[in-house]
Amino acid sequence: MDNKLFGTDGLRGRVNAYPMTPDVVMRLALSAGLHFRNGSRRHKVLIGKDTRRSGYIYEYALSSGFCAAGMDVFLTGPLPTPAISFLTRDMRADVGVVISASHNPACDNGIKFFDHMGFKLPDAVEAEIAARVEGYAQDWRLPDPDHVGRAFKLEDSPGRYNVFLKNSIPLDVNFEGLKIVLDCAHGAAYRVTPQVFEELGAKVIKIGVDPDGSNINQRVGSLFPQQVARMVAEAEADIGIALDGDADRVIVADEKGRILDGDQIMAICALDLMERGALPGNLLVATVMSNMALEVFMKDHGGRLLRTPVGDRYVVEAMRAQGAVFGGEQSGHLIFLNHSTTGDGTLAALQLMKIMVRKGKPLSELATLLSPFPQKLVNVPVARKIPFSEAPAIEAAVKDAEATLSGRGRVLLRYSGTESLARVMVEAQDAALVESLCDSLAEVVARALA
């Protein structure tokens, strides 16, 4: 079924432009409400958001649609995406909804859904909801006036999530004596995450905790970890933690100010799990974007890496299918399935710090486990998105690049699921070769898809 609304991580776009207009979002909620409503019992939907000013628009549009569909709405206010995933389970809600465009600027916003277990919706379910939105009609079977829903504020939602996060750390572990630099990107975690680390004993130097509705992700957070890295070195802190706007991803810096991406964090955590016999089948799940060095690392330590398409939802789907408990993305989405059903930047940082404490090692020493192969990624603006195989010039250029690499590297081309971009990635052990191949491929893609 064709799905024109949803991308790789829900609905996303510029505020007040299709599909992020109030009428489309209201119909989306109405469609989702009719999909999840089952029988005559009262149904519940949990709605959270990040700190964008436009969140108010979509909060009310969603509430209107869900109430019209006969569902009771519980509003959490600004809260991380993984908190909504957790609270959907905790509240026994039928569905959870997050209003956020994640790491995008404040001019964008988005909508993503979680099922009653806190998992992101499969493609097929999103397609069904999208089809009903596009086919909106006055004869939808809506409840009578006595059975429409009501809206409530869930005042204790941050506290519930706080307790959940602290319970992911054993009682014999605390962060007394550790100093951290924490960047919340002026986003959804600006209140709850600093509080969690402080209650666990850490001294927290906070940045990105003053949202004004328009400064989310503005040269802060996981896309700009250089600020955290610099401050860690200056403050002689033990670790720097940079979250994105909805706090479902994390990038860290060691005590020397060196930045670690999701692959390096996965290597540290996967080895710890393997050493404790807590990684079933010694299997780590990551995406096609993860560095080849991670694959080599897992093999060298008796494990294996399973790759999926880009998107933490696909990582989670593969983990569930394979019985895996840990996986993630190079971008910093990290999923500890024994604790959470989606990527959680705060939880991932807690697990990493737990390893530092238990091993008694600085992060810089743990980071030596993985030395990523040189990799270059170029985002190429495109006017159209056709299969790369249907562009002869691109196909020929890729074959030439792969022949040059001779199995000692990788070429990956894919489209962004949310923007008009083609992503060109090349990696190999020869940095100069990576640079030249990636630049030439990007030029070919730009000409072919202009």
UniProtKB/Swiss-Prot annotation:
Cofactor annotation comment: Binds 1 Mg(2+) ion per subunit.
Example GO molecular function: phosphomannomutase activity
Gene3D superfamilies, sorted: Alpha-D-Glucose-1,6-Bisphosphate, subunit A, domain 3, Alpha-D-phosphohexomutase, C-terminal domain
Keyword Protease listed: no
EC number: 5.4.2.10
Residues binding Mg(2+), per UniProt: 102, 244, 246, 248
PTM sites of type Phosphoserine: 102
CDD domains named among the record's database cross-references: GlmM (cd05802)
GO biological process, one term: peptidoglycan biosynthetic process
Catalytic residue list: 102
Catalytic activity: alpha-D-glucosamine 1-phosphate = D-glucosamine 6-phosphate
Pfam families per the UniProt record, alphabetical: PGM_PMM_I, PGM_PMM_II, PGM_PMM_III, PGM_PMM_IV
A cellular component annotation (GO) from this entry: cytosol
InterPro entries, sorted: A-D-PHexomutase_a/b/a-I (IPR005844), A-D-PHexomutase_a/b/a-I/II/III (IPR016055), A-D-PHexomutase_a/b/a-II (IPR005845), A-D-PHexomutase_a/b/a-III (IPR005846), A-D-PHexomutase_C (IPR005843), A-D-PHexomutase_C_sf (IPR036900), A-D-PHexomutase_CS (IPR016066), Alpha-D-phosphohexomutase_SF (IPR005841)
Described function: Catalyzes the conversion of glucosamine-6-phosphate to glucosamine-1-phosphate.
Protein name listed in UniProt: Phosphoglucosamine mutase
Organism: Solidesulfovibrio magneticus (strain ATCC 700980 / DSM 13731 / RS-1) (Desulfovibrio magneticus)
